[in-house]
């Protein structure tokens, strides 16, 4: 099951279940305060001295089946080449969790390394399914990451997708949107 949520709602649940073993994966320096285990491909062990830190090396996540009560993957999946395998790994190590992803709009507005994000996402509210396609840059980015964070306070639901999952992360690959069908929009050229 996959459904929309908010990080505020997720945190309220986590704070009521302090006995849960919670993993925050790929969070860099911004781990969820309720996480008991932090995992990343970079070594942040010096930063997370008060929590268990696990450095990820390779595709397989170094955890036992259903080791965690809850897994947080915020702004991670869009970076992973084999996202399908990663989703299966999340489902293997926990039975529920929270996923946060940039929306297609948010991903097009923000200046980032153009090769950093591989995938585009939107959520089909009728089917409760994550729709995934290769990222297409349809708008010349004009907002910095720092500015986007400020915008998120007001336009969060337009810039990010927040999902809670239990047992299974339902998704569908949809490659119907093709770059060649669009002329890239540049707001700088409009003025």
List each language-model region with its residue ranges.
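Conserved SAM-binding loop and adjacent beta-strand
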Residues: 1-9, 50
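Conserved SAM-binding loop
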Residues: 11-106
């Amino acid at each position: 099951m996959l459904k929309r949520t908010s990080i505020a709602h997720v945190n309220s649940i986590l704070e009521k279940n302090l006995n849960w073993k919670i993993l925050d994966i790929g969070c860099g320096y911004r781990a969820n305060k309720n996480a008991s285990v932090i995992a990343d491909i970079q070594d942040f062990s010096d930063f997370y001295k008060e929590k268990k830190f696990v450095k990820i090396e390779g595709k397989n996540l170094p955890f036992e089946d259903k080791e965690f009560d809850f897994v947080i993957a915020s702004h991670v999946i869009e970076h992973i080449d084999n996202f399908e395998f990663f989703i299966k790994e999340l489902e293997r190590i926990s039975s529920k969790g929270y996923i946060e992803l940039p929306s297609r709009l948010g991903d097009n507005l923000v200046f980032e390394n153009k090769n950093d994000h591989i995938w585009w996402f939107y959520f089909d509210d009728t089917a409760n399914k994550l729709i995934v396609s290769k990222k297409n840059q349809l708008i010349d980015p004009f907002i910095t990451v720092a500015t986007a964070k400020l915008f998120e306070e007001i336009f969060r639901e337009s810039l990010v997708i927040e999902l809670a999952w239990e047992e299974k992360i339902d998704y569908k690959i949809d490659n119907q949107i093709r770059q060649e069908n669009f002329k890239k929009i540049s707001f700088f050229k409009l003025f």
